[in-house]
Structures are given as structure tokens and as C-alpha cells.
From Swiss-Prot:
The gene is dxs1. Thiamine diphosphate binds at H73, S113, H114, A115, G145, A146, N174, Y285, E367. This is 1-deoxy-D-xylulose-5-phosphate synthase 1. It comes from Streptomyces coelicolor (strain ATCC BAA-471 / A3(2) / M145). Catalyzes the acyloin condensation reaction between C atoms 2 and 3 of pyruvate and glyceraldehyde 3-phosphate to yield 1-deoxy-D-xylulose-5-phosphate (DXP). PANTHER family: 1-D-DEOXYXYLULOSE 5-PHOSPHATE SYNTHASE-RELATED (PTHR43322), 1-DEOXY-D-XYLULOSE-5-PHOSPHATE SYNTHASE, CHLOROPLASTIC (PTHR43322:SF5).
């Protein structure tokens, strides 16, 4: 057995020799490369924290000592060392999550995986332990760009205010955020400043000098200032120490002994300490190190030797379609600019940045600032396009509401990874945007159903200069084009029937689901009209008279069914005094487990069979048994779905 295979928990690390620790690190990297290549996942960040994670678990007693991970995608090594070595179904249904998970292990504390939050968590946990008289340690690991987030600095400000509250902050500086500091004097002074003896001597000297009449305070301030200036010339800790944090480093994050030594010194303090570790993203895997874009931050299923993607080739992604079209628009309009929050490549803005380097800004992990800056750009006569993941726009709701919408700024928000994202798990599903944003006055929301509509609606959005607009689209490849057969007002009609009883409102990428459901229903003699509203907020006025000609309206959306498009449609029909029942199909009010997107949609009942079955059951409840022409009466179980042989079975969770 390998050394790694013999590790059942953190305590097994403590008896290993220096040579064995080096061998273990090599085994972990080899394991990660091959395991993540089979499933896809975050490879580069985890290759960079191998020694750091080993040192953390050798110095601290997890789970009694709480080790908290910011941006939890760098927790794979932590999982391996805490008894979770079955990576065969990583990020797959029934397998390990790609992020920390409380359901998996007592060693996992934070699982939301949104960056820059760990220091706030650590501040609260440290306060709780101090109030309760506990002596265990709280260790917050932050890095991979997370210190660009404003929340991290808000937390640092509060952490530093309590000089007597122990808390250890480990900065994983993987050369993507900080410039490394060099020089033995800097290391020596950092070590000196973090010894108990030095702190006692400093406190004694300060007390003596400040009690000396007339000159004492002046002498102390002069000496203290000279010391700070001398040290800051060699090391970057001035900012942290000015906040009141003890600074230790920089430390070679790939030297287990050096990291352990720094962490043990940090444990001896009675206040907040920051340990600065220099690491290399993608360490030990040459293809990752050669990847200038992001050092293999995330990879799909691939050959670990050639790095060639494996599996069936998909079509163009939604992201790439957006990226190509925004460049075309930029060629035509010099006023169109772009903003993203540390996601230039993932959201498709890299081609725009290459073509127009002076018209794009990456603001770091700062969605709030992105929205407010966009308001300023719009007020200055430009049209900003803010491209972020849908789940991260939640952070900028107040700014979108009060800075963009209130001021009627012409800003276009483009939400990538909207709806069910699947394998990235609960915190990365973009399933709340169309619910949360329903309350924003003046905001227009578009949900394109295919690539052509994405291109068209993006152009429609940037043409609006007196209100905010928003487009949303999912992860993965774009499906085939879904042509319209007619247009009623602003509605695209995708399907009609001679005797239509059901109006299916297909929100964006749910169009194929609705068309499939219509086909199943019509096989049972239930005629359907399928429309795509294109712009789902505000509700198109043409929908009310169309709905009035049907027995039932069903709204199908890849969004929370609570307060989503279905609710908005029901409200609009009520205001228009159209007395037709509205059934809402969407994502239930729960956090979704990681699985493939298709698996999640099936689990929550967003498939053609599920939608058709529950619509048939609803119609059966609305009339006496045997009244329907064209077939036998449908059973009336209260609610249900259509099985393959036409029977009604109990529903899944995605409808009410």
C-alpha cells in the first residue's frame, strides 16, 4: 500500500518522517492528476496546496481545531487527508462534492464556496470560542484571489480590533495575487516580530518610554516609525500590521517543515496572526504550469498525459456564443464596454479584452463594485455589459436596485451559469435570479432559448439606454435552434394546435421541455400552444388575451418556482381579470445536491414526461370523469405525472 492509502485521518500524518512526507506529497499530486482527469474538477488550485494542507493537519487537531477553507475548490487534499479517498464519483451524483460538505465529514465547516467569506466565519467562530471559554484554534485559509473581495477586508478590520482574540489566518499566495517578498532580513524580522519575548519587550519599552515626561512619547513614536519604515522596505506586511495583525512570512508553502514551524509559532500568540505562504498553482504538473490562462484552474474529463479532452464533443457553449457576439457589437459601437469580477475567461470576455483592451475591466471578486462602477460608466455616456455567474449576482442586489435601477442607468447584466449548473453543487446553481430580481422596477429580463435568440436579445439589451437589462443562460452547450412559427405581440409562438386547451409558457432553455410535453399531451388528445415570452420581465401584455383562450396556463422555468416567472404571470393574469389557473413548474425551495444537469432536472420533475403528466392530472381534476373526448378518463389522484403507458403517478418536487 502507498503512504496515502494508509492515511485514514489527520492523526496518521503525525508519525511520518520528513522523507515520508515528501513521498506522500508526490503521491497526492499523482492521485489528483489522474482522479480529476477522470471526472473533471478543480485541479490547479489543489496541486498548489498539497504541502500546506499536510502541514495544517499535522499542526492542528481537526475537527476540534476548526480549519476553514475559503473558495472551497482548494479542499481536495483536505478531503484525502480526512478519510475521503474515493474520488471515483467526484462531483457526480452520489459521490464526493467538489467543495467542503458537512454531510461528508465533521472536518468540513464551510460549504457555500463563494469567495471572501472565510474571514467573517472565522471572526464569528473565534468570538464564540472566546465567550464560551474554549481553547481550541480557529484557522482560516484564504487565497486564490479571495483577498480581492471587499468582505475579506471588512472581516480583517473587525478581526484586528480584538488584539486578545486568537485567530490564525493563512494566506495561500499562489502567485496569482501577491508579488513575493525576498531577503533573509525580511524573514528574520518577521520571525522576530512573532515571538513572545519580542512582544513582551515591546510592551515594556512602550510603557517605560510613554511614562517618561516630555520626551518619552516622542521618542517612542520616532523609534516605532523608524522600525516600521525599515521593515516595510523589505517585506509587504505593513498593511496587515497597520490593521493590527501580526504578520509571519513569507513562507515557502511547499516546505512542510517551514510551514509547520510558522504555524506552531502562530499558535503561541494570544491575538490574530497572519501567516503568508507562497505556493505555486498547478505545482508538479507541467501542463498546468504551462497554462498561462489559469494554471488548469478547472479541467474537464481528459487524458492526464496528453491533456486532450475525452468523451463526446459538444457544440458551441452559451458562453462562447456570447463572447463572439459581444465582440461584434463592440466593433459596431465604441460606447459598449465590459466589466467582470475575476471571471474574464469563464464568462467569455477574453476575446473582447483582446480586441478592446482599453474597454474591459476585471474588478476582482467585487460584484458590488462592478455594479456601481457600471452605473458610473453608464452615467458617463457608455453602455457597460457586466458579465458574471448568476449565483454571484446575488451579492450585488442592493447595488443593482439602488445604484443602477433607481438611476435608470443603461447597464446590461449577462448571467452565465443560470439555472441548474449541476456538478458544482448547491452554492453554484443560478436558480434565484428571476425570483430576486422580480422586484426591481424598470429592469427587463431576457431568457434566450437558443444561440440565435442570445445574439438577438443581447443586441436588444444594449440598445436600451434608460433602464437596466439582463440576459441569462445556462452552462454547457447550446442546443439546436428552436424556430418560431408565429409572433403574437412580443411572444414567439413555438407550437400551435387546432383545439388548444393548454398554454405552455416556455422560459428560455425550457422550450424543448415544453415542446416535448406538448407532443405527449397531444398524443392523449390534449391540444397545446407553446410560447416563448423572450423577455420574461415585464410580462408581455399579449399573454393575457392568449391565456384567456385556454383552460390552463403552465409556466416552465429553470429557476426557483417561488416568486419566479410563474408567479409574475399569475399576478399579471389576475390584474387583467383572466380567470385561468396557472401551474408553476420550476426548482423547489431547497438547495440542490451535485449531479449532472440532466439528472437534477429529472429529480425535480423538469422533464417532458413529468410536465405532461401533471398537466394531464390537473385537467382531469377540473372536469367530471369520462367527459374528455379522444380517450378514457384520466385517474384523479390529486396530482401526478404521466408514466410511459399513460398512467398517472405521484409527482416530483418541481411543481405546484
Amino acid at each position: 500500500m502507498t503512504i496515502l492509502e494508509n492515511i485514514r485521518g489527520p492523526r496518521d500524518l503525525k508519525a511520518l518522517s520528513e522523507a515520508e512526507l515528501g513521498e506522500l506529497s508526490d503521491e497526492i499530486r499523482d492521485f489528483l492528476v489522474h482522479a480529476v482527469a477522470r471526472t473533471g474538477g478543480h485541479l490547479g488550485p489543489n496541486l498548489g496546496v498539497v504541502e500546506l494542507t499536510v502541514a495544517l493537519h499535522r499542526v492542528f487537531e481537526s475537527p476540534d481545531d476548526r480549519i476553514l477553507w475559503d473558495t472551497g475548490h482548494q479542499s481536495y487534499v483536505h478531503k484525502l487527508l480526512t478519510g475521503r479517498q474515493d474520488f471515483s464519483k467526484l462531483r457526480s451524483k452520489g459521490g464526493l462534492s467538489g467543495y467542503p460538505s458537512r454531510e461528508e465529514s465533521a472536518h468540513d465547516v464551510i460549504e457555500n464556496s463563494h469567495a471572501s467569506t472565510v474571514l467573517g466565519w472565522a471572526d464569528g467562530l473565534a468570538k464564540a470560542r472566546q465567550v464560551q471559554g474554549e481553547r481550541s484554534h480557529v484557522v482560516a485559509v484564504i487565497g486564490d484571489g479571495a483577498l480581492t473581495g471587499g468582505m475579506a477586508w471588512e472581516a480583517l478590520n473587525n478581526i484586528a480590533a480584538a488584539r486578545d482574540r486568537p485567530l490564525i489566518i493563512v494566506v495561500n499566495d499562489n502567485e496569482r495575487s501577491y508579488a513575493p517578498t525576498i531577503g533573509g532580513l525580511a524573514n528574520h524580522l518577521a520571525t522576530l516580530r512573532t515571538t513572545d519575548g519580542y512582544e513582551r519587550a515591546l510592551a515594556w519599552g512602550k510603557d517605560v518610554l510613554q511614562r517618561t515626561p516630555v520626551v518619552g512619547h516622542t521618542v517612542y513614536e520616532a523609534l516605532h516609525g523608524a522600525k516600521k519604515g525599515f521593515k516595510d522596505a523589505f517585506a509587504p506586511q505593513g498593511l496587515f500590521e497597520d490593521l493590527g495583525l501580526k504578520y509571519l512570512g513569507p513562507i515557502d508553502g511547499h516546505d512542510i517543515g517551514a510551514v509547520e514551524s510558522a504555524l506552531r509559532r502562530a499558535k503561541r500568540f494570544h491575538g490574530p496572526v497572519l501567516v503568508h505562504c507562497l505556493t505555486e498553482k498547478g505545482r508538479g504538473y507541467e501542463p498546468a504550469l504551462r497554462d498561462e490562462e489559469d494554471h488548469f484552474h478547472t479541467v474537464g474529463v481528459m487524458d492526464p498525459l496528453t491533456c486532450e479532452p475525452l468523451g463526446p464533443a459538444g457544440g458551441p457553449s452559451w458562453t462562447s456564443v456570447f463572447g463572439e457576439e459581444i465582440v461584434r457589437i463592440g466593433e459596431e459601437r465604441a460606447d459598449v464596454v465590459a466589466i467582470t469580477a475575476a471571471m474574464l475567461h469563464p464568462v467569455g470576455l477574453a476575446p473582447f479584452a483582446e480586441r478592446f483592451p482599453d474597454r474591459v475591466w476585471d474588478v476582482g471578486i467585487a460584484e458590488q463594485h462592478a455594479a456601481v462602477s457600471a452605473a458610473g460608466l453608464a452615467t458617463g455616456g457608455l453602455h457597460p455589459v457586466v458579465a458574471v455567474y448568476a449565483t454571484f449576482l446575488n451579492r450585488a442586489f442592493d447595488q443593482l436596485l439602488m445604484d443602477v435601477a433607481l438611476h435608470r442607468c443603461g447597464v446590461t447584466f449577462v448571467l452565465d451559469r443560470a439555472g441548474v449548473t449541476g456538478v458544482d453543487g448547491a452554492s453554484h446553481n443560478g436558480m434565484w435570479d428571476m425570483s430576486v430580481l422580480q422586484v426591481v422596477p424598470g429592469l427587463r429580463i431576457a431568457a434566450p432559448r437558443d444561440a440565435d435568440q442570445l445574439r438577438t436579445q443581447l443586441r436588444e439589451a444594449v440598445a436600451v439606454d434608460d433602464a437596466p437589462t439582463l440576459l441569462r443562460f445556462p452552462k454547457e452547450s447550446v442546443g439546436p435552434a428552436v424556430p418560431a412559427v408565429d409572433r403574437i405581440g412580443g411572444l414567439d409562438v413555438l407550437h400551435t394546435a387546432d383545439r388548444s386547451e393548454v398554454l405552455l409558457v416556455a422560459v428560455g432553455v425550457m422550450a424543448p421541455v415544453c415542446l416535448g410535453a406538448a407532443e405527449l399531451l397531444e398524443a392523449r388528445g390534449i391540444g397545446c400552444t407553446v410560447v416563448d415570452p423572450r423577455w420574461v420581465k415585464p410580462v408581455d401584455p399579449a399573454l393575457a388575451p392568449l391565456a384567456a383562450r385556454h383552460r390552463l396556463v403552465a409556466v416552465v422555468e429553470d429557476n426557483s418556482r417561488a416568486a419566479g416567472v410563474g408567479s409574475a404571470v399569475a399576478l399579471a393574469l389576475g390584474d387583467a381579470e383572466v380567470d385561468v389557473p396557472v401551474r408553476r413548474f420550476g426548482i423547489p425551495e431547497q438547495f440542490l445536491a451535485h449531479a449532472k444537469r440532466a439528472e437534477v432536472l429529472a429529480d425535480i420533475g423538469l422533464t417532458p414526461v413529468d410536465v405532461a403528466g401533471r398537466i394531464a392530472a390537473s385537467l382531469a381534476l377540473a372536469e367530471p370523469a369520462g367527459d374528455r373526448a379522444g380517450g378514457p378518463a384520466v385517474e384523479q389522484p390529486g396530482d401526478g405525472r404521466m408514466s410511459g403507458d399513460g398512467r398517472i403517478v405521484m409527482p416530483a418536487q418541481g411543481e405546484n
